[in-house]
């Protein structure tokens, strides 16, 4: 909406006087909103956005252009975009009825053109974008995504913004190795378990993380360490020498969160996973 003013001047017999200033307001006939179906994002995750254009006027609005900035932000003198449009994902509805997809320029920025909103009606544009390497993965990260609508019949561009925040999550993988690879009876062997967390949230005791393994052949005379510290059977782990079943006590496996660095040149984020290491050594 826009405020306008007007003032008149009266002249007479070589004199003049000004009227009061009259104020008026041009109301927008188009109301634009933008919402995200998912309130959070994670690296590589798809986010679904819904843009609604509602025409409160008595004439249709034709040839509108909807420009989506894909969350672009300034970095190192340029603009980087934390969202990548998913090609072919756009769906358009007019008054709830599916229509042909609009003309799309993937950008960035993303542009939908030739949009018509009927008088007293609405258009809904649904599209998807993927959080990419420029999306902040650390706790507190956010993407501010703005659409701008322009075209004939609008007194000024109309914008709407939606913010999604990064999801606090753990993302764990585990690998196992044995040394030495070739052994004979009564040799000592070591199993090494490496747990990696590429998520932004640490694994803490209340998460009750645990490892279970059955050693075959069965091991005897176990020694166990976690991140270099010795563990005690019955306290941090349990082992059945009759079956070879090894289990850590839930809550003893702790894994730090990943750390993230934004490249000072490109602006892309890279992750260094948090790592925890469990070793189990025994005699075959």
Specify the residue positions occupied by each region the protein language model found.
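Exported/extracytosolic protein signature
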Residues: 1-284
């Amino acid at each position: 909406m826009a405020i306008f003013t007007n003032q008149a001047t009266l002249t007479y017999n070589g004199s003049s006087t000004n009227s009061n200033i009259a104020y008026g307001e041009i109301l927008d006939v188009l109301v634009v909103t933008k919402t995200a179906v998912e309130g959070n994002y994670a690296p590589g995750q798809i986010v679904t956005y819904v843009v609604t254009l509602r025409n409160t006027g008595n004439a249709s609005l034709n040839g509108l252009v909807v420009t989506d900035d894909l969350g672009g932000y300034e970095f190192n003198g340029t603009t980087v975009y934390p969202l990548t449009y998913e090609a072919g994902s756009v769906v358009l509805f007019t008054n709830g009825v599916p229509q042909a997809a609009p003309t799309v320029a993937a950008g960035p920025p993303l542009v939908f053109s030739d949009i018509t909103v009927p008088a007293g009606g609405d258009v809904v544009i649904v599209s998807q974008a993927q959080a990419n390497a420029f999306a902040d993965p650390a706790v507190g990260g956010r993407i501010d995504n703005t659409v701008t609508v322009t075209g004939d019949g609008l007194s000024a561009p109309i914008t709407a913004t939606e913010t999604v925040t990064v999801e606090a999550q753990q993302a764990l993988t585990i690998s196992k190795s044995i040394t030495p690879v070739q052994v004979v009876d009564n040799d000592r062997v070591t199993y090494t378990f490496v747990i990696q967390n590429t998520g932004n949230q640490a694994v803490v005791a209340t998460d009750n993380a645990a490892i279970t393994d059955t050693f075959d052949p069965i091991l005897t005379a176990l020694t166990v360490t976690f991140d270099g510290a010795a563990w005690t059977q019955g306290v941090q782990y349990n082992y059945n020498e009759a079956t070879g079943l090894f289990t850590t006590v839930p809550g003893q496996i702790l894994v730090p969160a990943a750390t993230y660095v934004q490249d000072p040149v490109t602006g892309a984020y890279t992750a260094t996973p948090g790592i925890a290491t469990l070793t189990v050594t025994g005699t075959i």
